[in-house]
Amino acid sequence: MLTEKGRGYDVAIKNPERFHGASPFDIETGKGAPAAPGTPPKYQDVMGETLLKLAREDANIVGITAAMPAGTGLNILEDALPNQFFDVGIAEEHAVLFAAGMATSGFHPVCAIYSTFLQRA
């Protein structure tokens, strides 16, 4: 059985990850509602921007995720430095072992996984 994300809502079908954990949005366009003035940045955005800054300075810094690039902020790294980004799919155990292998080869992996999914690792 395969999950079909967004079934019945064209905007979600075109971008299923965007609606995986949706916050308020315009139902016509699918665009997210603007943040209220003074709202602090999202943790994942701070993480992604910080990792990107570090990765630009060191090509051995890589980001690894298990099918959650936007939710972890690694989509920022993916967009800017795709050769330093790895999405292993829904395989947290592989992400952790992949990171360990890369570390033994001189890389500096950042493995971003939701804690609830680490039970699978």
Residue ranges of each PLM-predicted region?
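Thiamine diphosphate
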Residues: 1-121
